[in-house]
């Protein structure tokens, strides 16, 4: 394998995973890859679905696409990485311990938030790289992140103070610093025009991979009643990965539940 030529397609990802899986008898010393399926399964799945040419919801946020053929194919592929190809543990994989599994070389590849990058950089005792996620019909990744809010039922003084803090935290110099110290993206292109972040990216090119991957990004799953809808999809993904339902059955059930919840918003 050429570490400077990471897998660019699903087929290449599987092939690389097989070469990277190391066994001692019946036990696995190092898995080829791990994709977390607790914490934010819907988020990881948004990448796989988009790579297969399918979004998880419409632009109005009142209809989901969980039972579309391309969505089902994406979940079948995810499950097959463990059940058929043997490059990933079967069942669920913990979000919270995956980074440590990578640092301990229990998996050769991990799919995870770019917010782990600086911690991995500081703690990895081996050379590592960062690559864009592989494509099937196209490349795809979900966006992530959080928000600042100012509540209307607060005093004018509190609102002014909140706005002052938000303006400070969102200055290009601050978001660039935040990116370097965490691995998260700078929250605007201006951050990447600061000398500090430009110098950092020049010295550590992996810091620019997630930024460059935005070209292929889709919005993360967001609908009316988002929390409930995400839970429906999370449960469906996990039930398929552990084998209690087929991907088609699990996603069909999730779609029916989401339809009942979202029809009032159409």
Language model region names:
Residues 8-14, 89-104:
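Short helix-initiation/N-cap motifs at beta->coil->alpha
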Residues 11-64, 107:
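Extracytoplasmic/periplasmic solute-binding protein
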Residues 14-21, 60-91:
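Glycine-centered hinge/linker elements that transmit conformational signals in sensory
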Residues 21-37, 171-182, 261-266:
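Bilobed periplasmic-binding protein-like "clamshell/Venus-flytrap" ligand-binding domains
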Residues 72, 76, 80-89, 121-185, ...:
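Extracytoplasmic/periplasmic substrate-recognition and gating elements
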Residues 95, 112-117, 134, 146:
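Beta->alpha turn/N-cap motifs
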Residues 108-113, 129:
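Paired acidic/hydrophobic, glycine-rich loop segments that form the ligand-binding mouth/hinge
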Residues 131, 180-232, 239, 265:
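Long, aromatic- and glycine/proline-rich binding clefts that accommodate carbohydrate-like moieties
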């Amino acid at each position: 394998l050429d570490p400077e030529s990471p897998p660019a397609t699903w087929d290449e990802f599987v092939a690389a995973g097989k070469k990277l899986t190391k066994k001692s008898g019946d036990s696995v010393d190092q898995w080829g890859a791990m994709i977390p399926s607790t914490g934010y399964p819907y988020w990881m799945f948004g990448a796989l679905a988009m790579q297969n040419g399918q979004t998880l919801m419409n632009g109005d946020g009142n209809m989901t696409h969980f039972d579309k053929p391309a969505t089902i194919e994406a979940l079948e592929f995810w499950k097959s990485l463990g059940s058929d190809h043997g490059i990933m543990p079967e069942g669920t994989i913990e979000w919270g311990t995956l980074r440590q599994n990578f640092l301990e070389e229990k998996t050769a590849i991990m799919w995870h938030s770019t917010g782990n990058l600086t911690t991995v950089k500081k703690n990895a005792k081996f050379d590592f790289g960062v690559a864009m996620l592989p494509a099937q019909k196209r490349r795809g990744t979900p966006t992530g992140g959080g928000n600042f809010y100012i509540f209307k039922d607060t005093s004018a003084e509190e609102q002014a103070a909140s706005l002052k803090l938000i303006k400070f935290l969102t200055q290009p110099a601050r978001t660039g610093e935040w990116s370097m110290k965490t691995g998260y993206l700078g929250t605007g292109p201006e951050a990447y025009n600061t000398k500090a972040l430009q110098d950092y990216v020049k010295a550590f090119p992996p810091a620019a991979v997630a930024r460059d991957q935005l070209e292929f990004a889709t919005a993360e799953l967001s609908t009316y009643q988002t929390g409930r809808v995400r839970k429906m999809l999370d449960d469906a993904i996990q039930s398929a990965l552990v084998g209690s339902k087929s991907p088609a059955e699990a996603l069909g059930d999730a779609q029916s539940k989401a339809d009942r919840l979202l029809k009032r918003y159409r």
